[in-house]
């Protein structure tokens, strides 16, 4: 499968996974292995930046790319502060911006996220903004220096699938400068496959794997789904027909 060039790196896997909601941290390395994910996102509020003891980072392989996120930030100022703390603590220059002041639906504030993106991109961060799928805002993220655009498929943690499918299709069609990563709401491997068939460059998910009865097996299922969806997109779909059309012609068969 073709590689994903993003944030100054070349990746084999187009499946990004999160680290929350697992029954224990011990299962995380096994999920990373089964999913073959290379990009692992971690909420900075779950990371003890002053200690390596019983730290979530201890369970993430050294060859994985760490994508810290600013979960808990309510505005641009708080997101920027968390990003700078992350970089100072040695967590790298990749940052996923989450700026959410809505505590009920946890929908991202595009305005505050764009402000944070512009500030951090100028400071040398590769910024991955979590956003509501709006075309004009997506263009503003690109202009602000985002390394990718990350539209939500459904409210975070709901496992409801691609409820914003038509909006995401518009972003895929119109935003060519940076990768499109579908983030949040993906509940089943078929959702991930569909996102990749649509032309998304990658998907990021957490709850669907972490809350599965068998997270290790589910990680593998998502790996296969993402690969299948990407290959189907690259292969190009056959044309749809209004009427039935036999695969083998019947003319002359019964002479």
UniProtKB/Swiss-Prot annotation:
Cellular localization per UniProt: Cytoplasm
Chief subcellular location: cytoplasm
MF annotations from Gene Ontology: thiazole synthase activity
Residues that hold 1-deoxy-D-xylulose 5-phosphate according to the record: 157, 184-185, 206-207
Pathway stated in the Swiss-Prot or TrEMBL entry: Cofactor biosynthesis; thiamine diphosphate biosynthesis
Gene Ontology cellular component annotations, sorted alphabetically: cytoplasm
Record-given protein name: Thiazole synthase
Origin species: Clostridium tetani (strain Massachusetts / E88)
Lineage of the species this protein comes from: Bacteria, Bacillati, Bacillota, Clostridia, Eubacteriales
């Amino acid at each position: 499968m073709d590689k994903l060039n993003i944030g100054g790196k070349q990746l084999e896997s187009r499946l990004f996974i999160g680290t929350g909601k697992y029954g224990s941290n011990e299962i995380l390395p096994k999920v990373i292995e089964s999913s073959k994910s290379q990009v692992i996102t971690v909420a900075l509020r779950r990371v003890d930046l002053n200690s390596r003891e019983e730290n979530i980072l201890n369970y993430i392989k050294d060859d994985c790319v760490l994508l810290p996120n600013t979960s808990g930030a309510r505005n641009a100022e708080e997101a920027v502060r968390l990003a700078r703390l992350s970089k100072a603590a040695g967590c790298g220059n990749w940052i996923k911006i989450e700026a959410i002041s809505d505590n009920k639906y946890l929908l991202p504030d595009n305005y505050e996220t764009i402000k944070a993106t512009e500030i951090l991109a100028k400071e040398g961060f590769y910024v991955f903004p979590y956003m509501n799928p709006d075309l004009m805002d997506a263009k503003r993220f690109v202009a602000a220096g985002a390394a990718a655009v990350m539209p939500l498929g459904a409210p975070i943690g709901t496992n409801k699938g691609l409820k914003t499918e038509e909006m995401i299709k518009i972003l895929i069609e119109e935003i060519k400068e940076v990768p499109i990563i579908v983030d949040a709401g993906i509940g089943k491997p078929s959702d991930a496959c569909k996102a990749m068939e649509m032309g998304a460059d990658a998907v990021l998910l957490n709850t669907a794997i972490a809350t599965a009865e068998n997270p290790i097996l589910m990680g593998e299922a998502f790996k296969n789904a993402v690969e299948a969806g990407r290959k189907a997109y690259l292969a190009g779909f056959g044309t749809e027909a209004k009427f039935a059309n036999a695969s083998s012609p019947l003319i002359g068969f019964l002479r």
